[in-house]
Every structure is written in C-alpha cells, then in structure tokens.
C-alpha cells in the first residue's frame, strides 16, 4: 500500500441557513466550485497542473434540486476544471465529507490515482432537510419510525442516558464561547476562503459582503438565555432539546487535497496529515447520536491506540445531548482540547460538508496546539457513527 497524505485544506465560512443566510444567493454547486479553485490555488496546482487531478469526490446529502444530479461532477465543471477530471458524489449523511476523504485515501493507496480533491457541500437554505421525503411506510416494522426526525433521536439520547437540560445548555454555551474566542483571535482566518456575496439586507434588498467568518456564532448568549428556550422537538414535561442546544442548519463547502507520496515529491507539495484509522459503525437509529461513542473505540482498536494517546478531539455537536453523552462515555468531557474552537452548535452543521470542514480545521489546529494525534468523529443520521484518527506529519 502506498503512503498517502493530506496536503492542503480550505473551507468557506459557514452561513446560517434561512432567508438571511449569507449564501442565500449562491448555489451549492457554485459554492463547491469556489472551494475547489481556492484549494488548488493554495496548493499551487494551477494552469496545466490542474490536469493532474485524477478525481473529485464531493460529499452531500438530500441530493435533490441543485444538490442533485451528481453535484460532484457539476462542481468540477463549474470550477473550470479540464473535462478529463471526473467527479462523483458520496452520501453518508453527516459523515459524507469524511467518507469522501477516506475513499480518496484508499483509492490512492491502492495505486488507482495520485491526486484527488475530496470534500463536501451542503446548502440547507436552498435544499432543506426533508425536501421531497418519501419514507417507506413499512419502516416501523424494522425500527422506531420516528428516527427520521433527528431532534427526536436527540431527545431519546437525553432520556435514555439521563442527560439533563442543564448539562446540554452548558455544553452549548461553551461551544459559542470557544467559537467566538477563536474568531476574535483570528484562528479561523487561514482555513476560511473569503467569498464575495450578495447577502440579504434588512430593507429586503441585498448588499455586497465578503463572507470570511462564520455567521451563527452568538457571543451574546448566556446560560440564562439558553434556559428560557422551549423544547422544539417534543413538548412533554421530559423534553430538553431546544434550538439553543442543537446544531444550526447551515450552508457551506469544504475540501482537502489528497496525494500520494510520489505526487507530493513531484509537485513540491508538503504532507501535513496522515490517516491512521477510519471506522464506521451502525447503532440503533432511535439513538443515532451515540455513534461517536461506538465508532471511536473501533478506530482506536484499528490503530492499536488508547484514548490517552489522543491529543486533540473534534467531535461534531449535532446536539448537546449526544455530545455530552459521547464525551462522558469516553471520559473526555473535560479534556482541554475537546472542540477547542467550538463545533456544530456554534459554527453550524452543514451535513455533507461537516466531515471535510473538521478535517480542514484540524489541519490548522494540530500544529497550533502541538497535537501529534487527533480524532475526528460525528454521529450520522439513521443510526451510524464515523471516526478518523489523524497523525500530524507536517
């Protein structure tokens, strides 16, 4: 098997989906095309060198409308890539962006390619979750049919494992504070590709803006404000999951450049990250949020490593209930480098993009914090979990 590395990564800022999204007037395929071009420019893959890209793997879910018809290929064409560069789309829901990276690494390791762009995109303003949903009426014969609601599964995690409202709100508050601090200190600046956009204005029109920061971070939130929010997915006396302790729906794109050791040498690139292990698991769909607590031990076993050897943790915050459960189960809830710059609750969770967004963030976090090994993980809709162990080699 050949040696394979991540050599560059870039993402857009994450816009808060809805009528006021900063990316409301940019299509998903155009957003992905911007990231493809930004990635190659940062890596110095310009001009005729672009022909050396063997493939483009793009993750996404709810693959309809502008997210449909193989957006991976569409975005490749819209980026002005040579027609000889193919593209495909991968859907493992919340882990799609990480799955594309693992596919790219495996493809290159097998000797079938040398240079692949892998990433993800999601535009939840233009293609909301549930668009044209057609769930099988026999679903209830196989699992809890309510599992199609991610918020319902978050409530089930909270109830089954006694995750209090206070714990959830505390976790959410910390996410916003960490993300705000990182933004103020400019820690996201290098990973974000500035995007010129016509953003919605307060008067109903639009205004020009360079989008270079994440839209959903709330530095003014407080535990008191979070405590006042009403549950949104269930309304009985046991309900604890609110908009404040759930991830935001988002619009964003991210991509990394994956290359063989030989291609890195040929093009004068610099290896940064190496995939040590990658694991996916299935869990009860009704409590899909526990996925990381199952996937991470599987990845550690693959690598022959222990939790104590991991320096930095990036576990996506789909919901505070599941993030609290997973981190407590793993014994890392108070780890000093657990989501050190916030995650899905504060930054947003652009489903198919998130895995690539986290990998890109890690590319900048690992050298900053002096981390040798890092874990990236997320729960995945319909009862799955994914986890990757990264080694810094830069």
Regions found by a protein language model. Give the residues of each.
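Glycine-rich loop/linker segments at domain edges
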Residues: 12-19, 105-161, 219
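Active-site pocket-lining segment
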Residues: 155, 188-191, 276-346
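Conserved catalytic cysteine-centered active-site region
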Residues: 26, 60-114, 145-152, 220-248, ...
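Active-site-proximal alpha-helical scaffold in enzymes
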Residues: 90-121, 158-188, 255-262, 350-371, ...
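N-terminal extracellular/periplasmic Venus flytrap/periplasmic-binding protein-like
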Residues: 10-13, 24-34, 45, 167-266, ...
